[in-house]
Amino acid sequence: MEDFVRQCFNPMIVELAEKAMKEYGEDLKIETNKFAAICTHLEVCFMYSDFHFINEQGRSIIVELGDPNALLKHRFEIIEGRDRTMAWTVVNSICNTTGAEKPKFLPDLYDYKEDRFIEIGVTRREVHIYYLEKANKIKSEKTHIHIFSFTGEEMATKADYTLDEESRARIKTRLFTIRQEMASRGLWDSFVNPREAKRQLKKNLKSQEQCATSPTKVSRRTSPALRILEPMWMDSNRTATLRASFLKCPKK
């Protein structure tokens, strides 16, 4: 699974996921399913935000790659992917600037057009079940919830899907492709089934004990589908800024 994740996702997303797991004391070499889930969630958050801007009239517009209007205001502020201290700093700044109610839990995005925080969910289960779990945890009508599944289903607060249909279809297509690629490599069943995942985890731990001192040969082959899809969605005008702000950390 780890090899798949490194081939499938944009390097910046992989790096952010590694930092997040390290922050919570989790080992990505062991908890590979969680590594994949974090990368998937991060990518959906970035895809949700990319190419969406607010013009001078306050209307939401979509600006594709290469468009000269780079100075337009980004519609969404990305909170997910930052370390907790910086994330809360961003949330507090937004609340102070906009007057928004401070959420109890860290949200994933802030929508400057609709003036609301957004919680993004990506689930391997039924969307309505995951939606209810999110709603029960957050317990706030101020935070908008939007859930996506790997089967193309989605659910959002008051059926308000925020994005246009094409933008949402792009996210759904990406999730479906990730699922298909996992399935083709025999990874999907353990990713979606907790019992199978635990069995795989025990197998990984045993394998690590046996091969702790042995060199590991890693396959670098990437399927044609992944070569096409890998980081193509990333807004190149924003990548450098995101890398600088998200990955900044003191050198030890």
UniProtKB/Swiss-Prot annotation:
Sorted keywords for this record are: Decay of host mRNAs by virus, Eukaryotic host gene expression shutoff by virus, Host cytoplasm, Host gene expression shutoff by virus, Host mRNA suppression by virus, Host nucleus, Host-virus interaction
Source superkingdom: Viruses
GO terms (molecular function) for this protein are:
RNA binding
- GO term, biological process aspect, one: viral RNA genome replication
Q: Which stretches does UniProt call biased (Polar residues)?
A: 207-217
* Chief localisation class: host cell
By its UniProt entry, which InterPro entries does this protein fall under?
PA/PA-X, PA/PA-X_sf
Q: Where is this region: Disordered?
A: 202-221
Record site feature (Important for efficient shutoff activity and nuclear localization), residues: 195, 198-199
Compartments in which it is found: Host cytoplasm; Host nucleus
Identify the catalytic residues: 80, 108
Read off the Pfam families from this record: Flu_PA
Chain positions of site Important for efficient shutoff activity: 28, 65, 202-203, 206
Comment field on protein domains: The probable endonuclease active site in the N-terminus and the basic amino acid cluster in the C-terminus are important for the shutoff activity. The C-terminus acts as a nuclear localization signal. The C-terminus is recruited to host protein complexes involved in nuclear Pol II RNA processing.
Q: Which family does it belong to?
A: Belongs to the influenza viruses PA-X family.
Q: What function is annotated for this protein?
A: Plays a major role in the shutoff of the host protein expression by cleaving mRNAs probably via an endonuclease activity. This host shutoff allows the virus to escape from the host antiviral response. Hijacks host RNA splicing machinery to selectively target host RNAs containing introns for destruction. This may explain the preferential degradation of RNAs that have undergone co- or post-transcriptional processing.
User: What name does UniProt use for this protein?
Assistant: Protein PA-X
